[in-house]
């Protein structure tokens, strides 16, 4: 069953592309027609591509891996932050930090610096600093929070990127390609689909369009996380059951051995008596 449908996408305006003069010829297979100088996206193909991307991203989440959402354009910032947070995934909605992926250790150092500042505030050291130092540190903390706060929990490279506008986020896409990280993306008629592993042809300039697609994608991630959780519970239950069976069998073995040991002297007693009588004769 599809995660969305033609009518829902149509109502959200997912079919509106860019002006014909701005189109990328590589998007031709996903364009249905031209109307008033604007390309119209084939939503039947969009439905299929959403399902393909959702299934792939579900498997990534099921393995316990992270998906990094990237959307620095104004129309998509809020909805991406909301949807990514709902499934506990990291996101970047401010300026993309150059080297975020290719120079990840440096980014992690900046995140740790933010944690160290928080520690200063909590352990009382902060109050011993001068007003000027406190102001400088506070500004630095605010800047780090703005740019890196949403990826503070990202301790290793993400397993995938989900990009809202591959044209605008070309630096992030290029870094992911260099590292072999799969890219999922909403691709409008002015973008190149060849730089994306899982393309979702749709309007990337509309808040409603982005929200409808993210509902399907984040729904798939939530399913993957739930299935992972259920499998973990089943595995633990199976382990406890196996331990219980082993414990139940162990006493019976010891009891059987004890009974055998008790029976042995009883059987040996008549034999000893017979031997004594024979010796007396």
Regions found by a protein language model. Name each.
Residues 1-66, 72-73, 77-120, 131-134, ...:
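N-terminal cationic and glycine-rich segments that engage phosphates or anionic surfaces
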């Amino acid at each position: 069953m599809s995660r969305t449908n033609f009518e829902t996408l149509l109502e959200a305006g997912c079919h509106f592309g860019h002006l014909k003069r701005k189109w990328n010829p590589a998007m031709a297979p996903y364009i249905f027609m031209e109307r008033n100088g604007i390309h119209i996206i084939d939503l039947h193909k969009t439905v299929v591509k959403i399902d393909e991307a959702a299934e792939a991203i579900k498997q990534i989440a099921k393995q316990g891996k992270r998906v990094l959402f990237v959307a620095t354009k104004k129309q998509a910032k809020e909805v991406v932050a909301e949807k990514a947070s709902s499934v506990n995934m990291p996101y970047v909605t401010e300026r993309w930090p150059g080297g975020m992926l290719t120079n990840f250790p440096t980014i992690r150092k900046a995140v740790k610096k933010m944690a160290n500042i928080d520690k200063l505030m909590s352990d009382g050291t902060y109050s011993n600093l001068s007003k000027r130092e406190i102001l400088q540190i506070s500004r630095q903390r605010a800047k780090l929070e703005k740019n890196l706060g949403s990826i503070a929990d990202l301790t290793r490279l993400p397993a995938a990127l989900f990009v809202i506008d591959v044209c605008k986020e070309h630096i992030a896409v290029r870094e992911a390609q260099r590292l072999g990280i799969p890219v999922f993306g909403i691709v409008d008629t002015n973008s190149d689909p060849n730089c994306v592993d899982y393309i979702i042809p749709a309007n990337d300039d509309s808040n409603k369009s982005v929200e409808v697609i993210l509902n399907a994608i984040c729904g798939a991630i939530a399913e993957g996380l739930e299935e992972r959780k259920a499998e973990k519970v089943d595995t633990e239950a199976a382990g406890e059951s196996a331990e219980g069976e082993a414990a139940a069998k162990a006493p019976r073995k010891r009891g059987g051995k004890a009974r055998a040991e008790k029976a042995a002297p009883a059987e040996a007693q008549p034999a000893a008596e017979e031997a004594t009588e024979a010796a007396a004769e």
